[in-house]
């Protein structure tokens, strides 16, 4: 059911009480269960009664009343832990929130706390809030953030980030935090508009997540005074301690571009950390193929392998998370009153579940998945196929700018002096400089420049997958870039790679040109084929999907290609403005 004002109605609560009193039968009984008591940090034995989607009893008794509808499961050979929580999900990395939630639940991650940015920008408020309510009808629990900024420079930022819109998002019961705050430099230097929204968030007793890579003690201190309560950008044990000492809830990340959780945990232990109750685990919204090896189960296993006590390894993905968000009254522990999210394990040191309950429903039973073929009605919420109703000609592709952008790793861009003759239609493959063009998705403006460090042999690439949904063209051959653009138009958005006038790899993104409508497993295969083709043509960094997403993202150094033009992040100025077509 959708969480509106109350999760359970008065009638439902009365029925739950009747089960405890023996007047009604539970729907599911887990007898002889060894479970993690998260509050005590102990493994205890009990019988667990569930009525529909709620745990109603945990103790030594069996129900006084059972009927033909009651399922009784002997759990004597297993251990049970709470369903895992991913508190920092970006559910739009080619996949969509529905497909990701279904896939995650099958691996034991039954609660997602999601970034709202893409839907905040792409949908009008009423449709977006109706969409998140409909998504909460899944077996998974789906919660959301409220962004304060677009993490880029937009032509119509004020039209998106309105007081009334932010206020309604913040007040929604499925929205449990503000952030992540990527425009923190603006707040420190005087942006009272964002500070007002932060104050509103704290007034509503909701936490605020920051985005503070490499931040000093003074910066972290100031952000704490401004109301920020957590951060996920610690990259060393020392940076974790700096945040903990300043009172932050601190996320420990293991993602496609920062896969160093084991190193961070080792450094924390070497520095004397033995209390992990103010830490949480996150995969930070990685692309599809990263999740082949698991989601929160994978991170818990890394923690266990590094000698973290089981109560903490599981706690950082369950109880500690729920407690921080003020959701421990219904999530994160196995106790009466909580939603029936439960993972069944063969043993304590293998967090990959053999069976999973989500809201009291079996989504996995003895390794068999159930209910993963459901379809979500995206078009009902205005999320339709991308339509590009304008054309692009070879004559428009002129690259005379003296300064280009250099991709130094998956996500960092630096300025560089263009060293090749860019007036030609085709560039040589003995260097890594390519043509680069950002195009308004409505065809109104363009930003032509050069990119170094992306690849040596990419002939033509087109992508509508970007922070703002605007269109990226990259390549050595202008004619193949045009072919890629036209193929992108025809397939309704996504990513297209062209060589010698032919499409050699593509990822269709049928939902607004940003998200795939396919199951996670299919998107994984499409992504792997695309990445393989790109690597064969000289892409050498960790994650090309993040590269495409972050070309416009001003929360990262040093320069970005935004709707307003090429933007200097440090100086907060437009170096070269966009050109009207």
From Swiss-Prot:
EC annotation from Swiss-Prot or TrEMBL: 3.5.4.2
Keywords, in A-Z order: Hydrolase
Signal peptide extent: none
GO biological process annotation, one example: adenine catabolic process
Catalytic activity, as annotated: adenine + H2O + H(+) = hypoxanthine + NH4(+)
GO MF annotation list: adenine deaminase activity
InterPro entries linked: Adenine_deam, Adenine_deam_C, Amidohydro-rel, Metal-dep_hydrolase_composite, Metal_Hydrolase
Enzyme class per UniProt: hydrolase
Matches recorded under Pfam families: Adenine_deam_C, Amidohydro_1
Assigned protein family: Belongs to the metallo-dependent hydrolases superfamily. Adenine deaminase family.
UniProt name for this protein: Putative adenine deaminase BH0637
């Amino acid at each position: 059911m959708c969480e509106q004002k109350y999760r359970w109605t008065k009638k439902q609560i009365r029925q739950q009480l009747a089960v405890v009193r023996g007047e009604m039968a539970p729907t599911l009984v887990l007898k002889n269960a060894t479970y993690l008591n998260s509050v005590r940090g102990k493994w205890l034995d009990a019988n667990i009664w569930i009525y529909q989607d709620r745990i109603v009893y945990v103790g030594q008794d069996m129900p006084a009343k059972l009927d033909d509808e009651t399922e009784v499961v002997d759990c004597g050979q297993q251990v049970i832990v709470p369903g895992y929580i991913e508190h920092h999900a970006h559910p739009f990395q080619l996949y969509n929130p529905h497909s990701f939630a279904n896939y995650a639940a099958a691996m034991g991650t039954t609660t997602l706390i999601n970034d709202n940015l893409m839907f905040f920008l792409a949908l009008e408020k009423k449709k977006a809030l109706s969409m998140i309510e409909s998504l909460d009808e899944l077996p998974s629990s789906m919660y959301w953030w409220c962004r304060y900024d677009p993490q880029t420079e937009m032509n119509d930022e004020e039209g998106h980030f309105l007081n009334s819109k932010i206020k309604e998002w913040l007040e929604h019961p499925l929205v449990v935090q503000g952030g992540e705050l990527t425009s923190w430099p603006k707040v420190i230097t005087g942006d009272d508009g964002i500070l007002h929204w932060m104050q509103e968030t704290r007034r509503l007793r909701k936490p605020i997540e920051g985005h503070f890579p490499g931040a000093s003690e003074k910066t972290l201190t100031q952000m704490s005074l401004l109301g920020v309560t957590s951060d996920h950008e610690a990259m060393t044990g020392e940076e974790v301690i700096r945040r903990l000492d300043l009172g932050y809830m601190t996320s420990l990340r293991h993602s496609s571009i920062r896969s160093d959780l084991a190193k961070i945990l080792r450094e924390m232990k070497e520095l004397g950390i033995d209390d992990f109750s103010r830490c949480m685990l996150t995969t930070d919204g990685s692309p599809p193929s990263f999740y082949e090896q698991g989601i929160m189960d994978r991170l818990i296993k890394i923690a266990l392998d590094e000698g973290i006590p089981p109560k903490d390894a599981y706690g950082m993905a369950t109880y500690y998370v729920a407690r921080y968000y003020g959701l421990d009254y219904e999530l994160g522990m196995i106790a009466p009153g909580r939603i029936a999210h439960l993972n069944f394990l063969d043993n304590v040191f293998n967090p990959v579940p053999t069976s999973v309950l989500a809201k009291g429903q079996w989504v996995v039973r003895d390794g068999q998945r159930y209910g993963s073929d459901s379809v979500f009605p995206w078009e009902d919420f205005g999320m339709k196929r991308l339509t590009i109703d304008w054309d692009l000609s070879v004559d428009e592709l002129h690259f005379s700018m003296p300064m280009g952008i250099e991709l130094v790793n998956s996500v960092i861009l630096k300025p560089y002096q263009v060293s090749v003759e860019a007036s030609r239609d085709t560039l040589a493959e003995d260097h890594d400089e390519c043509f680069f063009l950002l195009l308004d998705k409505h065809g109104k403006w363009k930003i032509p420049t050069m990119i170094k460090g992306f690849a040596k042999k990419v002939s033509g690439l087109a992508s509508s997958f970007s922070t703002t949904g605007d269109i990226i063209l990259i390549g050595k051959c202008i004619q193949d870039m045009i072919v890629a653009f036209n193929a992108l138009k025809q397939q309704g958005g996504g990513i297209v790679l062209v060589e010698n006038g032919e499409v050699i790899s593509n990822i269709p993104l049928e939902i607004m040109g940003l998200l795939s409508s396919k199951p996670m497993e299919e998107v994984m295969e499409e992504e792997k084929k695309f990445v393989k083709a790109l690597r064969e043509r000289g892409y050498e960094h960790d994650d090309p999907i993040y590269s495409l997403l972050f070309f416009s993202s001003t929360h990262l150094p040093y320069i970005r290609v935004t709707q307003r033009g090429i933007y200097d992040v440090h100086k907060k100025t437009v170096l070269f403005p966009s050109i009207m077509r």
